[in-house]
Curated annotation (Swiss-Prot):
The keyword Oxidoreductase does not apply. Its main location: nucleus. It comes from Mus musculus. Residues 29-49, 297-325, 391-413 are annotated as: Disordered. Residues 203-222 are annotated as: Required for interaction with ZFPM1. Residues 391-406 have a biased composition (Low complexity). GO terms for molecular function: C2H2 zinc finger domain binding; chromatin binding; chromatin DNA binding; cis-regulatory region sequence-specific DNA binding; DNA binding; DNA binding, bending; DNA-binding transcription activator activity, RNA polymerase II-specific; DNA-binding transcription factor activity, RNA polymerase II-specific. Residues 305-318 have a biased composition (Basic residues). It is found in: Nucleus. This is Erythroid transcription factor. The modification Phosphoserine is found at S26, S49, S72, S142, S178, S187, S310. Transcriptional activator or repressor which probably serves as a general switch factor for erythroid development. It binds to DNA sites with the consensus sequence 5'-[AT]GATA[AG]-3' within regulatory regions of globin genes and of other genes expressed in erythroid cells. Activates the transcription of genes involved in erythroid differentiation of K562 erythroleukemia cells, including HBB, HBG1/2, ALAS2 and HMBS.
Length: 413
């Protein structure tokens, strides 16, 4: 497939669309320097003038490189595309390769060798990265990470127009217009200026409280504190603001007097057999003894009951348990209590181990009381002989058969 304008790349003459009249000399001027083609360059390099020979040698080297590049199967197409006026962002490509002017003009032409600009870019990028890392170390614990945008350089020295490309919008590719470095976001008070909904100043309509673990609402939608809301939910009415007084220990009734001791203060009013009111002390005394309480037992103060839990019951209970344990396990022996076994062996601690003869008592001294409830035929055998036994094997004698719960008397050594 043939592309228009690409066939001329294989020739040694400059392309018409790449030729600038101000940069390319006329054929008459160029004949004095070198003729067209490498033959002319070779002839010029053999000149007697040292300056002319040096210039001709450099031009010949560049000409051969350009010829090798243009005759290679790979073509550089982007200068041709940039030179087309119909493409957006295209710019005329000045062909400095065919003229006697300087290789690096001051126009917007892209130089062929970008070693110096790339080195400058790398140096500036390295400095920028170092500054950015220093800022990261400085504000590592800072909650406002958006202030890092101020560490970016103010502007980049190279723009898109220097390479013939279209310029991108600055808010996306310019550090000054990026969101990180904008004044609105890099301010230390950025978080405080966010459009958050202000916290409403709530107040309980019943008690006026402004702080509560949980805000509730009444039937009309007004705010209630947690206490008032729970009270209203349980009782269906507002919580009283005045706390109720403590329950009076002494019960006073206007005009009420004990018919036995004539006292007017008591913790509980009672009635006697005839229905007359009596104090608590006289009423209890009459209930227990069926006689009136003597007046000599009257006291001015009211004796209250000490309702604190005492540890006497616990001590008694512990002593009872200790006595029972001593009865079950006398010194020098032990008892085995076992229920009925499906195998018919009572007092069997393990498979192949029976406690029925007095001759084997020395094997089980020092074990203490052992209580086994329920069938014991499922127990696993002991892993080995008991410590302290003079023999190396367990007795396997026959055990007495029984079907009811039995207690073996303590064995004597």
């Amino acid at each position: 497939m043939d592309f228009p304008g690409l066939g001329a790349l294989g020739t040694s003459e400059p392309l018409p669309q790449f030729v600038d009249s101000a940069l390319v000399s006329s054929p008459s001027d160029s004949t004095g320097f070198f003729s067209s083609g490498p033959e002319g360059l070779d002839a010029a390099s053999s000149s007697t003038s040292p300056n002319a020979a040096t210039a001709a040698a450099s031009a010949l080297a560049y000409y051969r490189e350009a010829e090798a590049y243009r005759h290679s199967p790979v073509f550089q197409v982007y200068p041709l595309l940039n030179s087309m006026e119909g493409i957006p962002g295209g710019s005329p490509y000045a062909s400095w390769a065919y003229g006697k002017t300087a290789l690096y003009p001051a126009s917007t032409v892209c130089p062929s060798h970008e070693d110096a600009p790339s080195q400058a870019l790398e140096d500036q990028e390295g400095k920028s990265n170092n500054t950015f890392l220093d800022t990261l170390k400085t504000e590592r614990l800072s909650p406002d990470l958006l202030t890092l945008g101020t560490a970016l350089p103010a502007s980049l020295p190279v723009t898109g127009s220097a390479y013939g490309g279209a310029d991108f919008p600055s808010p996306f590719f310019s550090p000054t217009g990026s969101p990180l470095s904008s004044a609105a976001y890099s301010s230390p008070k950025f978080h405080g200026s966010l459009p958050l909904a202000p916290c409403e100043a709530r107040e309980c309509v019943n008690c006026g409280a402004t702080a509560t673990p949980l805000w509730r609402r009444d039937r009309t939608g007004h705010y209630l504190c947690n206490a008032c809301g729970l009270y209203h939910k349980m009782n269906g009415q507002n919580r009283p603001l005045i706390r109720p007084k403590k329950r009076m220990i002494v019960s006073k009734r206007a005009g009420t007097q004990c018919t036995n001791c004539q006292t007017t203060t008591t913790t509980l009013w009672r009635r006697n057999a005839s229905g007359d009111p009596v104090c608590n002390a006289c009423g209890l005394y009459f209930k227990l003894h069926q006689v009136n309480r003597p007046l000599t037992m009257r006291k001015d103060g009211i004796q209250t009951r000490n309702r604190k839990a005492s540890g006497k019951g616990k001590k008694k209970r512990g002593s009872n348990l200790a006595g029972a344990g001593a009865a079950e396990g006398p010194a020098g022996g032990f008892m085995v209590v076992a229920g009925s076994s499906s195998s018919g062996n009572c007092g069997e601690v393990a498979s192949g181990l029976a406690l029925g003869t007095a001759g084997t008592a020395h094997l089980y001294q020092g074990l203490g009381p052992v209580v086994l409830s329920g069938p014991v035929s499922h127990l696993m055998p002991f892993p080995g002989p008991l410590l302290g036994s003079p023999t190396t094997s367990f007795p396997t004698g026959p055990a007495p058969t029984t079907s009811s719960t039995s207690v073996i008397a303590p064995l004597s050594s």
